[in-house]
């Protein structure tokens, strides 16, 4: 009898917490999302699920069809040493998922290619946003990685104060997300959206 209960509980937990690479596809996107308000100005990533290098992302339109182009700079220690990637929008998978194809164009860098999908879960446009980002590497190991990003318009040295942490936890719980995304030490990252 104890074995049946343990197997049942394990099965329920397995369904409740999907494996990596599936979180963003299962999350409910913001229904009244306005891309023109979101893809404008600067955003700072104050938290993401896994520790890693600081990433600077700059978005601008390519001028021909009004689709944003994402410039990604990945580096350590405040961008003292970084690589640049250009990511062009490839279209939307549906009404809520914005997709980009990225490649390094720098001389001397490895030919790293990856695809990025953004799903905006919640946004106030002037203050904060919750975004689920899926990165799929199309070269090399072809790994897939999902992360929930907490974005703010203002860069602060205080990572997330207790008041905001409580608010973010409430937002995560409403969307049935695991609090595992909030268990790591936060890094400051910048997203800059500009229209040409």
Curated annotation (Swiss-Prot):
GO terms for biological process: suppression of blood coagulation in another organism; symbiont-mediated perturbation of host defenses. Glycans are attached at residues 62, 187. Keywords: Blood coagulation cascade inhibiting toxin, Glycoprotein, Hemostasis impairing toxin, Secreted, Signal, Toxin. Its main location: secreted. It is found in: Secreted. Residues 1-21 form the signal peptide. Salivary gland. GO terms for cellular component: extracellular region. One of its GO terms (molecular function) is toxin activity. CDD domains: lipocalin_LTBP1-like. Belongs to the calycin superfamily. Triabin family. Inhibits the intrinsic blood coagulation pathway by blocking the activation of host coagulation factor XII (F12) but not the enzymatic activity of activated F12. This is Dimiconin.
